Design a protein with these regions (language model features):
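Conserved beta-strand hairpin/beta-sheet module of binuclear metal-dependent hydrolase folds
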Residues: 4-64, 150-153, 157-161
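Short catalytic-loop micro-motif centered on adjacent basic/acidic residues
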Residues: 45-48, 75-79, 137
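Active-site metal-binding motif and surrounding structural segment of the metallo-beta-lactamase
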Residues: 54-101
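Short, glycine/acidic-enriched loop or turn micro-motifs at the edges of active sites
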Residues: 51-52, 83, 166, 234
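C-terminal regulatory/interaction regions
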Residues: 1-3, 236-272
C-alpha cells in the first residue's frame, strides 16, 4: 500500500495511515486504522491519530504532505477514545506543539495532564475554521462509545464517521489503498457484516432499520459526497456504495452474538 499513500480522496483531503493484518477464513484479512488530513487555507486538521503501531507511517505521511506546502497542522479531531483512533495522540501532540485536540475530550487529561491546556471541547454543530473550509462535529448515528462524534468537512462535503462504515478488505486481492468503488472483488455486505458482528455487538439488540434510516437522513441533510471511515475503504460514490454497507449492518444484526454462541457450544460439549 505504501506507493498509494498519502492519497487525496477529495480536494485537500488526504488519506493516510496503514492496514492491520490478521488471518480470517484462511486469507490475509486487513482492517484499516486510517487517519485523514484536511487542509484548509490557514490550517490543517488531522482526523484520527491511528493505531499505536502506525505512528511512524502517519508521521512520515504528514511530513510528505507538509513538505508539499499544505497548511500547518493546528487541529486534531479524534472521533472517540479507543486505541485504533487515538493511539497516536500523545506522540502527535508532542511532534506538533501548536496542535489543539478537539471533540469530546473526556479522560484525555488523565493520560496527558501536561497537554490539558491544548484540549478543546466540541458539541454537535461546533466548527473548526481551517480557512476556506470548516470541520464540524455532527451526529454519530452509529457509534462505538458514548463519547463518539463524527466529523464533517463543509466545502467538499466529506463525512468522517469513525466506526460508522467499518469493514475490512483482502490484502491478496490488492484492495489496500483503493477506494471502495475500485475494489470490485470486495463483497461489501459480507465484510461489513463481519466487522459489525465482531466489533459493534450492540447492533444485535437494536432495530438497525431505524439506524440506517437515520443515516440516510444525515447524508441527505449534509449533502455528503465522500465518506472517509476509519476502518474501511473511502467511499466516493455514496449512492452506489452506502446501500451495500447498510445491507451488511442489517445482516450482522440477525446473527447470534459470537461469544455467547461459543459458550453454548462449549457447554453442550462438556461431559455431564
Amino acid at each position: 500500500m505504501a506507493g498509494r499513500m498519502p492519497r487525496e480522496i477529495a480536494p485537500g483531503v488526504f488519506w493516510i495511515g496503514d492496514c492491520l493484518a490478521q488471518r480470517h477464513r484462511g486469507r490475509i484479512y486487513h482492517g484499516y486504522n486510517a487517519a485523514f488530513l484536511v487542509a484548509g487555507e490557514a490550517a490543517s486538521a488531522l482526523v484520527e491519530t491511528g493505531h499505536p503501531k502506525d505512528f511512524p507511517v502517519i508521521e512520515r505521511h504528514l511530513g510528505e504532505l507538509l513538505a508539499r506546502g499544505v497548511a500547518p497542522l493546528k487541529y486534531l479531531f479524534v472521533t472517540h477514545q479507543e486505541t485504533p483512533h487515538c493511539g497516536g495522540l500523545g506522540r502527535i501532540l508532542a511532534r506538533f506543539p501548536d496542535a489543539v485536540l478537539c471533540g469530546d475530550v473526556s479522560d484525555y487529561h488523565l493520560a496527558f495532564p501536561h497537554y490539558e491546556d491544548r484540549m478543546r471541547w466540541m458539541k454537535e454543530g461546533d466548527a473548526i475554521d481551517l480557512g476556506g473550509r470548516s470541520l464540524l462535529a455532527v451526529e454519530p448515528v452509529i457509534r462505538d462509545l458514548r463519547t463518539t462524534w463524527w466529523g464533517f468537512e463543509t466545502r467538499d462535503r466529506v463525512l468522517f464517521p469513525g466506526d460508522g462504515f467499518a469493514y475490512s478488505h483482502y490484502h491478496e486481492d490488492g484492495h489496500c489503498g483503493l477506494v471502495a468503488e475500485e475494489a470490485v472483488t470486495l463483497d461489501l455486505p459480507d465484510v461489513s457484516a463481519v466487522f459489525a458482528d465482531l466489533a459493534l455487538f450492540w447492533t444485535k439488540f437494536a432495530d438497525m432499520d431505524v439506524y440506517c434510516d437515520r443515516l440516510d437522513q444525515l447524508i441527505d441533510r449534509l449533502g455528503v459526497k465522500t465518506i472517509a471511515p476509519t476502518h474501511g475503504l473511502p467511499i466516493t460514490d455514496v449512492t452506489l456504495t452506502v446501500p451495500k454497507v447498510k445491507e451488511g449492518l442489517k445482516a450482522a444484526a440477525l446473527l447470534p452474538e459470537s461469544g455467547t454462541n461459543e459458550k453454548l457450544v462449549l457447554a453442550a460439549a462438556a461431559p455431564a
